[in-house]
């Protein structure tokens, strides 16, 4: 669909820019030193640094380690756990147990998987598609925030899941909220702040949600893709809307419904978007 193709184009664009950047750096490293060396030699100045320059020097590819700053290891013991998750936000310890996971797609659909763990400084983004069907060693600590986007399900499997340490609380909200086409509404003003499943009642589109702090400063904007023609993309689960969050539905054919999510981690909704 449009979302998948756009994600693929963005991914290819990022890869293309990275390749161009690397090529430019290589050219600069290989060409500039000899030119400067000749210039300095012609002016009578010594250029010992460039005379000793090693053209055969190789640069190791940098590999990002998302777990470089963790302060504790996950327990090797635990329960065997496997669950399929559709698109939405999931809090580790509330919606999914702590553990070391293998995340698998179906080999056809495109997914984006994001893990943000402020306490352990883990920030991970992975694409799961026909090329990358499986992502291994996904370490999810209690309190981490996991986001899934795409059509279908991602399967999360672990052999050390800490199911006995999970905790949650029922959502205090009980009433749904309708948002019509080309309508904008504010949490805390037009409807109660809280945690909702954003559902496409009819149509398809990409509503955007802007989050503000208590001073009115914009923190982030979240862009969703939902469609009533898909069993999994018709809902984005566990969308946290703190006081002042603005949801803008600018699509003329999209009707939305905010349905209170079943369970939540906390009523401190703004903390999901802030850093201590």
How should these model regions be labeled?
Residues 51-107, 112-276:
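Extended, well-structured beta-strand/loop surface patches
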């Amino acid at each position: 669909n449009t979302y998948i193709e756009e994600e693929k184009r963005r991914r290819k664009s990022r890869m293309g820019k990275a390749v161009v950047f690397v090529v430019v750096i290589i050219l600069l490293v290989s060409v500039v030193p000899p030119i400067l060396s000749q210039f300095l030699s012609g002016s009578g100045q010594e250029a010992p640094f460039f005379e000793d320059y090693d053209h055969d020097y190789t640069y190791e590819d940098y590999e990002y380690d998302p777990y470089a700053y963790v302060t504790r290891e996950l327990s090797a013991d635990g329960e065997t756990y496997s669950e399929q998750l559709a698109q939405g936000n999931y809090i580790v310890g509330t919606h999914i147990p702590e553990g070391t996971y293998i995340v698998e797609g179906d080999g056809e659909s495109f997914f984006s998987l994001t893990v943000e763990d402020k306490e352990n400084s883990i920030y991970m983004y992975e694409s799961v598609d026909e090329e990358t069907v499986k992502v291994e060693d996904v370490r999810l600590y209690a309190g981490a925030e996991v986001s899934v986007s795409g059509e279908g399900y991602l399967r999360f499997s672990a052999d050390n899941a800490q199911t006995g340490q999970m905790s949650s609380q029922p959502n205090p909200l009980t009433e749904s909220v309708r948002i019509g086409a080309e309508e904008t509404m504010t949490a805390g003003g037009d409807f109660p702040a809280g945690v909702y499943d954003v559902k496409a009642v009819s149509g398809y589109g990409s509503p955007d949600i802007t989050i503000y702090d208590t001073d009115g400063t914009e923190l982030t904007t979240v862009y969703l893709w939902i469609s009533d023609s898909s069993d999994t993309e018709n809902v984005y689960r566990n969308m946290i809307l703190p006081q002042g969050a603005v949801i803008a539905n600018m699509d003329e054919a999209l009707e939305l419904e905010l349905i209170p999510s079943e369970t939540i981690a906390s009523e401190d909704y703004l903390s999901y978007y802030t850093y201590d």
